[in-house]
Amino acid sequence: MAQHFSLGACDVVGFDLDHTLCRYNLPESARLIYNSFAQFLVKEKGYDEGLLTLTPEDWDFCCKGLALDLEDGTFIKLAADGTVLRASHGTKMMTPEALTEAFGKKEWRHCVSDKRCTSDKPGVSDIPCCSGKCYFYDNYFDLPGALLCARVVDSLTKQNRGQKTFDFWKDVVAGIQHNFKMSAFKENCGFFFPEIKRNLGKYVHRCPESVRKWLRQLKDAGKITMLITSSHSDYCKLLGSYILGEDFADLFDIVITNALKPGFFSHFPSQRPFYTLENDEEKDELPSLDKPGWYSQGNAAHLYELLKKMTSKPEPKVVYFGDSMHSDIFPAHHYTNWETVLILEELQGPEMEKPEEAEPLEKRGKYEAPMVKPLNTLSNKWGSYFIDSVSGRGRAEDSVVYTWSSKRISTYSTIAIPNIESIAELPLDYKFTRFSTNNSKMAGYYPLVHHTLGSQDTDSKIISTEK
């Protein structure tokens, strides 16, 4: 594979919507998502009302890349080899001694080193995958749910005097269905959509003009542009009109809503057909995709056949931008062999404030509300999303290891950027260095490597991905 990646070499450019083209005000959207689920659990399922009360400090628990053991309520931060770096029971962090006793240096019990989980490509099959008995929090929409679930575990443990196993996940899933079912936006039900409609500007950032111009530039350069989102069409229209303008759909040749990713990429056409839309409701099932337009559900195989026809090429080159490793990047890379650009807001540079550098509460104005830690900043409880330190491992001093999430980024992403704005003013033929260059773990970050990676003194600390 070539050392460099260029949009100019791509025939088709596709985008996710939420947290990719549409950037959210993370402190506000996190509170809204948390409250939407907490209200449901308390009011509909009878959970402790204490779940409705949060302090700013509570948000430090949130860190992308955590896994929840659905059986025992343990949250796990994994190393690249599937061993456990840090863990908590609910929100209560485990001590190093308890960590060693519970997990040792073995792969976590829900990790499976199995080529069927990843790929037969060299260098890929050594990434452990995880069973259906755990849930990974890999995006900002999910992340408030990690804090809520951890507090549920705390509450149930206290109520039941040390409860060891849990069955709350079914209620969390019911909360998702209640707030985000296909009819929720139209019916104005649940807690999320009614508030979003009332105060959209509080939660969502408009795209800068540079991004709108860049999308037009892609079309003017002859690229086919696509919007592929799991959001339903009515919510997509609300967001698209706000962030890009009323004519936002004209910026895309193909719009696919309710895409049900990652299944959009992995399912056979017979399992996931396309549907036409009428007044935001799904109508006719389509045996194939014959022309550009706006569709619902669907599959990557039929889409690719249409792209062949539109480009008059037997193998058009596609790149897809997304923020979720689980729903966007891994499946687009693994099942369709598309180029992938990961949106990683942790890379935002100057906007990235460490918690210890934040202004102390006592120095703030008397009536200024305490700030909620943005979800893309460093967690004191969990440390860096990208790396962590490990004692021993056969060495006389601590070693620094890559996390499971970090290794997946460098394996399945072509490049990673903080947001689309960061590349919108570059020429389309700009040559980005791929992650795959010399098997580098850091080459694909643009414009900057995250400070917890870039600041490593490799003369005094050893970056290790070994078991």
UniProtKB/Swiss-Prot annotation:
Broad class of enzyme this protein falls into: hydrolase
Protein family membership: Belongs to the 5'(3')-deoxyribonucleotidase family.
Residues with N6-acetyllysine modification: 181
Coiled coil spans: none
Alphabetized UniProt keyword annotations: Acetylation, Hydrolase, Magnesium, Metal-binding
GO MF annotation: an example: hydrolase activity
Gene3D superfamilies in alphabetical order: HAD superfamily/HAD-like
Keyword DNA damage: no
Lineage of producing organism: Eukaryota, Metazoa, Chordata, Craniata, Vertebrata
Name this protein carries in UniProt: 5'-nucleotidase domain-containing protein 1
Active site: 16 (nucleophile), 18 (proton donor)
SUPFAM superfamilies per the UniProt record, alphabetical: HAD-like
Membrane-spanning intervals of the chain: none
Residues reported in the UniProt entry to bind Mg(2+): 16, 18, 323
Entry superkingdom: Eukaryota
Pfam families linked to this entry: 5_nucleotid
Known EC number: 3.1.3.-
Species whose genome carries this gene: Mus musculus (Mouse)
PANTHER family: 5'-NUCLEOTIDASE DOMAIN-CONTAINING, 5'-NUCLEOTIDASE DOMAIN-CONTAINING PROTEIN 1
